[in-house]
Amino acid sequence: MSLTNKNVIFVAGLGGIGLDTSRELVKRDLKNLVILDRIDNPAAIAELKAINPKVTVTFYPYDVTVPISETTKLLKTIFAQLKTVDVLINGAGILDDYQIERTIAVNYTGLVNTTTAILDFWDKRKGGPGGIICNIGSVTGFNAIYQVPVYSGSKAAVVNFTSSLAKLAPITGVTAYTVNPGITKTTLVHKFNSWLDVEPNVAEKLLEHPTQTSQQCAENFVKAIELNKNGAIWNLDLGTLEPITWTQHWDSGI
């Protein structure tokens, strides 16, 4: 899929991986890049505009933990401005197993709520045009970092939720896939807390392993968006982009 002239909403598009990915996206000649983030960063927005002045870059403050009604209200404003939105990227995330409720609220519940809200505008059963959802998971959604089970569990939930969305595409008209970064050098992994302090030095130990840069991750992130494979579970690790084949152990039969 070419991203030229597409309208993209990027939740948390100013973070470590997020900002590098936003830089790559504007190079693809989007029509509009709408960034929703909790903290404004005028310098980053100005940089994105300077990279490609043909792309309209807009920022709205957004906390994914707000009620769905607030998200719907914001999306109404965005859809009124753009008329159509082609891609939603759900990228909000925290890594701190001290904050159990917030980790689940940001990494999973917020993603589900944002997705649910945009279905009001996209669902073909309501006369919508359909759309594409790219959810950011993590390799911990495949195999947990057991010292941070809350974070790992939230990312496993993202993978399952997104796989379900993909299978619902014939009903809703909305396709979905996950991009799952491996250990990436960002502020997210420089310092964080393990669950119940089971490993006080978990961040340091994690960074002893091979990592990738956020730029490497961002380049593969955008490649995954361009490949646009419904139901794909992408592994973005050590500068590579590979599809994951999920093993089915049970079938609901529905």
UniProtKB/Swiss-Prot annotation:
E.C. number(s) listed in UniProt: 1.1.1.1
Family membership noted in the UniProt record: Belongs to the short-chain dehydrogenases/reductases (SDR) family.
Known catalytic reactions: a primary alcohol + NAD(+) = an aldehyde + NADH + H(+); a secondary alcohol + NAD(+) = a ketone + NADH + H(+)
Binding site residues for NAD(+): 10-33
Protein name: Alcohol dehydrogenase
Active-site feature positions: Y151
SUPFAM superfamilies to which the protein is assigned, alphabetical: NAD(P)-binding Rossmann-fold domains
Gene3D superfamilies for this protein: NAD(P)-binding Rossmann-like Domain (3.40.50.720)
Gene Ontology CC terms: cytosol
GO annotation terms (biological process): alcohol metabolic process
Molecular-function GO terms, alphabetical: alcohol dehydrogenase (NAD+) activity
Subunit structure: Homodimer.
Classification via InterPro entries: ADH_Drosophila-type, NAD(P)-bd_dom_sf, Sc_DH/Rdtase_CS, SDR_fam
Uppermost EC category: oxidoreductase
Gene name of this polypeptide: Adh
A Pfam match: adh_short
Binding of substrate, residues: S138
Keywords assigned by UniProt, alphabetized: NAD, Oxidoreductase
The keyword NAD is assigned to this record: yes
PROSITE patterns with a match to the protein in the record: ADH_SHORT
